[in-house]
Amino acid sequence: MQQRRPIRRALLSVSDKAGIVEFAQALSARGVELLSTGGTARLLAEKGLPVTEVSDYTGFPEMMDGRVKTLHPKVHGGILGRRGQDDAIMEEHQIQPIDMVVVNLYPFAKTVAREGCSLEDAVENIDIGGPTMVRSAAKNHKDVAIVVKSSDYDAIIKEMDDNEGSLTLATRFDLAIKAFEHTAAYDSMIANYFGSMVPAYHGESKEAAGRFPRTLNLNFIKKQDMRYGENSHQQAAFYIEENVKEASVATATQVQGKALSYNNIADTDAALECVKEFAEPACVIVKHANPCGVAISNSILDAYDRAYKTDPTSAFGGIIAFNRELDAETAQAIISRQFVEVIIAPSASEEALKITAAKQNVRVLTCGQWGERVPGLDFKRVNGGLLVQDRDLGMVGAEELRVVTQRQPTEQELRDALFCWKVAKFVKSNAIVYAKNNMTIGIGAGQMSRVYSAKIAGIKAADEGLEVKGSSMASDAFFPFRDGIDAAAAAGVTCVIQPGGSIRDDEVIAAADEHGIAMLFTDMRHFRH
């Protein structure tokens, strides 16, 4: 098998034309003959490049509104022909070898994402000739280079220059892998789209079956290998979606520190997603995927100081997330006060990075500013299966709350209730959060009984000398018994926010009235397992 193959003839047919003119110019300048189709050929000709239309090469016109362009033996024979083995038959049928295929596919994902996209629109954006050429070239990678990503254009030209116009087998093989990944992802999108429409298509319903197709095809790209997984005996890697539309741990840039661990990434995700809930300057400190301190204030420095005070013991070795730029003063406060694994923020000032650089092991990530939250899917692996659900983006405002007790909450109690309700959404169930003056003062997480989460929150507040009297308490789900209210009242809580919906709601409300507690129902639950 020849290790290097000279590139003498290339076929270019792309939907995404970013960089294609410059790439074609570079190929042409190196003596490569250009074949092309449709809009790509017109663009290259407009730029003064010598290009042969595929229809002129095959002697067969494009037809059926462009549905049939490249499905021809002179095209696929030129791609699939085995050099040194099929030369005679190629010569007999006047088939010229094609050494490089540059193809990206019709924008199916963008089409079906458009509001009002019809089935007909989707069908017309299913590429046939493109994937066929991609697979043909990838199959024959020992002789042909297949290019599906514009990000590879520069590297390909450089390698050709380093190898007298040739590409190595290693490069062709790597490009083939990318090509098969590309077509697999493309077919998966189409299968998912049509799979979700089966009932509607067969006339069983006028509505689509929903966002859950009968076969779920997922495509993620490996971002990095991990030293190990959740535990040292487990191997692990981090995979991300190709086109993430929201600032996240997956899109974040690490600007300082040693490599992220599996647990670092999981905890950073928990911290970042929580801090996104707040419009005011906010700080979230997470340990083992649970918030251990959260606060909002007029500055991230004060927010950090108050979040830290919730539970300094748990904050040791934690993950810290901000929703504003990390500044020098805040960075200095963190470094001077505690050991921290990861700091993530939309951005970080140069001065802040100089300060954190003094602690080389501290990982600093910037993720960019986020806008509206993007709907998507959450996954949970079970043995032999996968649970899939919509992301929990639900959140209630003050106008949606129902006061179910005799006493109305004060303005501050209401603010604190809404604040700790946002935090409770990110605490493992059973979740109880005590808050006062826009900071958490006690968090009870992950207990099997709700009353013990309430007791733990009170114990934590007492241990840190934080006053519970006049505070608000959030519960991620309803109280099955009044004991959780009794525990909160004993600690000093005066306002409770919870979903409601228990068969014993009357008893729970009565307990609140007995203690003079204001109680708010959200009619929305936030279990987190």
Curated annotation (Swiss-Prot):
Record EC number: 2.1.2.3, 3.5.4.10
Keyword Transferase among UniProt keywords: yes
Tagged with keyword Endoplasmic reticulum: no
N6-acetyllysine sites (modified residues): K287
Pfam families: AICARFT_IMPCHas, MGS
Domain of life: Bacteria
InterPro entries in the cross-refs: AICAR_Tfase_dup_dom_sf (IPR024051), Cytidine_deaminase-like (IPR016193), MGS-like_dom (IPR011607), MGS-like_dom_sf (IPR036914), PurH-like (IPR002695)
Pathway: Purine metabolism; IMP biosynthesis via de novo pathway; 5-formamido-1-(5-phospho-D-ribosyl)imidazole-4-carboxamide from 5-amino-1-(5-phospho-D-ribosyl)imidazole-4-carboxamide (10-formyl THF route): step 1/1; Purine metabolism; IMP biosynthesis via de novo pathway; IMP from 5-formamido-1-(5-phospho-D-ribosyl)imidazole-4-carboxamide: step 1/1
Catalytic activity annotation: (6R)-10-formyltetrahydrofolate + 5-amino-1-(5-phospho-beta-D-ribosyl)imidazole-4-carboxamide = 5-formamido-1-(5-phospho-D-ribosyl)imidazole-4-carboxamide + (6S)-5,6,7,8-tetrahydrofolate; IMP + H2O = 5-formamido-1-(5-phospho-D-ribosyl)imidazole-4-carboxamide
Record-linked Gene3D superfamilies: 3.40.140.20, Methylglyoxal synthase-like domain
Molecular function (Gene Ontology), one example: phosphoribosylaminoimidazolecarboxamide formyltransferase activity
Any one of the GO CC terms: cytosol
Boundaries of every MGS-like domain copy: 1-148
Keywords: Acetylation, Hydrolase, Multifunctional enzyme, Purine biosynthesis, Transferase
One Gene Ontology term from the biological process aspect of the record: 'de novo' IMP biosynthetic process
HAMAP family, A to Z: PurH (MF_00139)
Family: Belongs to the PurH family.
Domains as described in the record: The IMP cyclohydrolase activity resides in the N-terminal region.
The protein, known as: Bifunctional purine biosynthesis protein PurH
Taxonomic source organism: Escherichia coli O139:H28 (strain E24377A / ETEC)
Lineage of the organism: Bacteria, Pseudomonadati, Pseudomonadota, Gammaproteobacteria, Enterobacterales
